[in-house]
Amino acid sequence: MIQPQTHLNVADNSGARELMCIRIIGASNRRYAHIGDVIVAVIKDAVPNMPLERSEVVRAVIVRTCKELKRDNGMIIRYDDNAAVVIDQEGNPKGTRVFGAIARELRQFNFTKIVSLAPEVL
């Protein structure tokens, strides 16, 4: 469960290292975001000499959460960290690689480009 002021790791090579959620896209007063939700975030830490810089406002899609995700078949998935992938306005990832495992549910939310870049889909 991601809410405003939550810090997230960045799971791609876009140049950002850490994000802080400032808004959840989709509803005016949603409190929590889950896997597959798009958020507005600010970059808190970035790699030097990369296109994305610190204090830049970006959109990101959540790919991993510490909070459990329960599937219809009864399987429960939980990750060790909260992570997101930086995307552009069309929903395409800004980076060219995705690090770590991501959930299969992203395919249902039409983030197929992120799923194809991921090394492991759970």
From Swiss-Prot:
InterPro entries: Ribosomal_uL14 (IPR000218), Ribosomal_uL14_bac-type (IPR005745), Ribosomal_uL14_CS (IPR019972), Ribosomal_uL14_sf (IPR036853). Binds to 23S rRNA. Its main location: plastid. This is Large ribosomal subunit protein uL14c. PROSITE patterns: RIBOSOMAL_L14. It comes from Helianthus annuus (Common sunflower). GO terms for molecular function: rRNA binding; structural constituent of ribosome. Belongs to the universal ribosomal protein uL14 family. Coiled coil: none annotated. GO terms for biological process: translation. Keywords: Chloroplast, Plastid, Ribonucleoprotein, Ribosomal protein, RNA-binding, rRNA-binding. One of its GO terms (cellular component) is chloroplast. The gene is rpl14. Part of the 50S ribosomal subunit. It is found in: Plastid, Chloroplast. NCBIfam families: rplN_bact (TIGR01067).
